[in-house]
From Swiss-Prot:
Protein name stated in the entry: Delta and Notch-like epidermal growth factor-related receptor
GO biological-process terms attached to the record: central nervous system development; glial cell differentiation; Notch receptor processing; Notch signaling pathway; skeletal muscle fiber development
The keyword Metal-binding appears for this protein: no
Membrane topology: Single-pass type I membrane protein
Annotated organism of origin: Mus musculus
Modifications made to the protein after synthesis: N-glycosylated.
Region (Interaction with NOTCH1): 44-133
Disrupted-gene phenotype: Mice show no obvious abnormality and no apparent survival disadvantage. However, they have delayed cerebellar histogenesis and exhibit motor discoordination at adult stages.
Main location, first listed in the record: membrane
Transmembrane regions: 641-661
Disulphide bond pairs: 48-59, 53-80, 82-91, 98-108, 103-121, 123-132, 319-336, 338-347, 353-364, 358-378, 380-389, 396-407, 401-416, 418-427, 434-445, 439-454, 456-465, 472-482, 477-491, 493-502, 509-520, 514-529, 531-540, 547-558, 552-567, 569-578, 585-596, 590-605, 607-616
Gene this chain is encoded by: Dner
Modified residues (Phosphotyrosine): 711, 721
């Protein structure tokens, strides 16, 4: 007979078996069903009785020697031998999910899900369940009603998706009942409050997708069955276990139907149906698969449990019955949250010290008596006593102090305050003031009642002769510092003094250190030379140069006649250091409204129009009216002769003047008229203010400079003006040429 898939609802019996009663509520609450009470005590099961090895692993109890090993309390009392492809302490890690042959009556096929332990069992006829471990029950022969829904949806596409065939519903059909096993752990999940996600668009019925539904996530410990509790309004549902992708997409592709067990008030998903990690389920109310209405989307997250010891029996309580086995979404395992006053990994120890019964900062030590013990011991700090260290010890109650001493009790004991003349921890001994030899440095001790007196040796003083006599207290050194030396002293004299008491002063002038008839004046630890006026230096050894400290500026020289130096200034400067420039313009040397420009050792006059000379004293006269009258009365032919003669004479004079000047004269220039001098010196026509230029002309004789030309030049005659209103030279005569 050919095999079939465990989740395919194609067989007419599967919809009946898949109808599940479910209460649609939320908020998981956990609880445990009580184990059946045996009539007689059962023998303690072995470490492998609970079948701890998964995925076909073989459990082997450890030997007694291994169990007595110091680390045995932290390790299981058994070992698992895992088949090929499976690893882990409990054979919980499956590299190939089909390597352990999880399908009892069918073939295993690895799922395309991203989870490494996902597989799909294709069951043989007559079996179903997650691992094809459940035989199909017999089919009832009566009580069936015809469904009003269509017989089948659209044709199944070639994607190997399971067919969704509407079942015939039978109200009286019941699921297999649940019979609790001894020691079986069950968590009850109620559906009073759930997160409703209405109308989630996941697809349509033709692609075997569904939409909407209640979205619930619940966490359970490993090896624990889940009881889904229902209320009066719940309906039987069809439950499918799907992959993570199918769960997100509300798709039944790669899913399989599961058959929970009917229990009083709900449905039970056995622990064999749940693998470590998330387990995703999609449930439908009655025949809602045909209508694509999801009634429930459930995620059961199975986590490893650390709530019972590894060597515990199947009927051992989680967290020793003194705590709650709980987890958080951020945690990977279930662990114990102990009740008040219980501690330990499994809440196995009653902590009698948790409430801090010991007083006065005493240390509490809990007696290791497991859960039934409530004994503890208080270790009191010094000074306290009592079962809870609540009382302070009075060490003076027995009056330990003698001879009238006062007893003072403290946390560390008692102290006796002795009367004068007694000593000891209890003031039991009489004081001998000289017994301890209080007098030092060979001093003699004398008893004086309860006191003593010391007679000191020479050189020592003080109540116990411990101090040297301070010989320097009377300041015996006149000009020095006193230093105690043993039983005497020594004077360290200041510079310039000597003697036993530093009372004598040295006279440094006895060596005649001053030169050149200087006077020596004795000082303390030194001398001073008073020099004559012309000498200086520490010993008056240097002759004074009066010009050494005088600085004459602007070319001035120092005259060192006598004891004083005097600056002889260059022309144009004055002052003690020749630092004052004489302003020659103060005397107004420029005539006829000429402008004076002060210069070092001189001045320059800028003359107005019609005046020339060093001081603008030469007047240039132009007689145009007289010449015009003479020319008018003169005959025309004579006029032409005169004009021609004058032109020839002018040209000859000009040639002679230029040649003479170019041969023998060098013209220097200064101030703002330098361009005019340069043109005249280079034998070019004059094109500048000649009146200002002529005032500064100098001449040279045979290449040597002479005095200013204004002292040698004769008056100048002008005959005509140029078009730009500047005169033309006709004759310049000089002396001594």
């Amino acid at each position: 007979m050919p095999p079939r898939r465990a989740q395919a609802p194609g067989a007419p019996l599967l919809p009946v078996l898949a109808l599940l009663p479910l209460l649609l509520g939320a908020g998981p609450q956990s609880g445990c069903l009580a184990s059946p009470v045996s009539a007689a005590p059962l023998p303690a099961p072995g470490p492998c009785a609970s079948q701890p090895c998964r995925n076909g692993g073989v459990c082997t109890p450890r030997s007694v020697t291994d169990q007595e090993h110091p680390a045995a309390d932290a390790e299981p009392r058994y070992s698992c031998t895992c088949p090929a492809g499976v690893s882990g302490t409990y054979c919980q890690f499956v590299a190939d999910p089909c390597a352990s042959n999880p399908c009892h009556h069918g073939n295993c096929s690895s799922s395309s899900s991203s989870s490494s332990d996902s597989y799909l069992c294709i069951c043989n006829d007559g079996y179903e369940g997650l691992n094809c471990e459940q035989p199909l029950p017999s089919i009832p022969t009566s009580g069936w009603t015809e469904s009003t829904a269509p017989r089948q949806l659209q044709p199944v596409p070639a994607t190997q998706e399971p067919d969704i065939i509407l079942p015939r519903s039978q109200a009286t059909v019941t699921l297999p009942t649940w019979q609790p096993k001894t020691g079986q752990k069950v968590v009850e999940m109620k559906w009073d409050q759930v997160e409703v996600v209405p109308d989630v668009a996941c697809g349509n019925a033709s692609s075997n997708n569904s939409a909407g539904g209640r979205l619930v996530s619940f966490e359970v410990p490993q090896n624990t069955s889940v009881k889904i509790r229902q209320d009066a309004n719940s309906l039987l549902i069809l439950l499918w276990k799907v992959t993570a992708t199918g769960f997100q997409q509300c798709s039944l592709i790669d899913g399989r139907s599961v058959t929970p067990l009917q229990a009083p008030g709900g449905l039970v998903l056995l622990e064999e149906m749940l693998a470590l990690g998330p387990n995703h389920f999609i449930g439908f109310v009655n025949d809602s698969v045909a209508k694509s209405i999801v009634a429930l989307r459930l995620t059961l997250v199975v986590k490893a449990s650390n709530c019972v010891p590894g060597d515990s029996h199947s009927n051992d309580l989680e967290c020793s019955g003194k705590g709650k086995c709980a987890t958080k979404p951020s945690e990977a395992t279930f662990s114990c949250t102990c009740q008040d006053q219980y501690i330990g990994t499994f809440c196995e120890e009653f902590d009698a010290c948790q409430r801090k019964p010991c007083q006065n900062e005493a240390s509490c030590i809990d007696a290791n008596e497991k859960q039934d013990g409530s004994n503890f011991t208080c270790l009191c700090l010094p000074g306290y006593t009592g079962e809870l260290c609540q009382s302070k010890i009075d060490y003076c109650v027995l009056d330990p102090c003698r001879n009238g001493a006062t007893c003072v009790s403290s946390l560390s004991g008692f102290t006796c305050q002795c009367l004068e003349g007694y000593f000891g921890s209890a003031c039991e001994e009489k004081v001998d003031p000289c017994m301890s030899s209080p007098c030092q440095n060979n001093g003699t001790c004398y008893v004086d009642g309860v006191h003593f007196t010391c007679s000191c040796s020479p050189g020592f003083t003080g109540p116990t002769c411990a101090q040297l006599v301070d010989f320097c207290a009377l300041s015996p050194c006149a000009h020095g510092m006193c230093r105690s030396v043993g039983t005497s002293y020594k004077c360290l004299c200041d510079p310039g003094y000597h003697g036993l008491y530093c009372e004598e002063e040295y006279n440094e002038c006895l060596s005649a250190p001053c030169l050149n008839a200087a006077t020596c004046r004795d000082l303390i630890n030194g001398y001073e030379c008073v020099c004559l006026a012309e000498y200086k230096g520490t010993h008056c050894e240097l002759y004074k140069d009066p010009c050494a400290n005088i600085s004459c500026l602007n070319g001035g020289t120092c005259d060192s006649e006598g004891l004083n130096g005097t600056c002889i200034c260059a022309p144009g400067f004055t002052g003690e250091e020749c630092d004052i420039d004489i302003n020659e313009c103060d005397s107004n040397p420029c005539h006829h409204a000429g402008t004076c420009l002060d210069q070092p050792n001189g001045y320059t006059c800028h003359c107005p129009h019609g005046w020339v000379g060093a001081n603008c004293e030469i007047h240039l006269q132009w007689k145009s009216g007289h010449m015009a009258e003479s020319l008018t009365n003169m005959p025309r032919h004579s006029l032409y002769i005169i004009i021609g003669a004058l032109c020839v004479a002018f040209i000859l004079m000009l040639i002679i003047l230029i040649v003479g000047i170019c041969r023998i004269s060098r013209i220097e220039y200064q101030g703002s008229s330098r361009p005019a001098y340069e043109e005249f010196y280079n034998c070019r026509s004059i094109d500048s203010e000649f009146s200002n230029a002529i005032a500064s002309i100098r001449h040279a004789r045979f290449g040597k400079k002479s005095r200013p030309a204004m002292y040698d030049v004769t008056p100048i005659a002008y005959e005509d003006y140029s078009p730009d209103d500047k005169p033309l030279v006709t004759l310049i005569k000089t002396k001594d040429l």
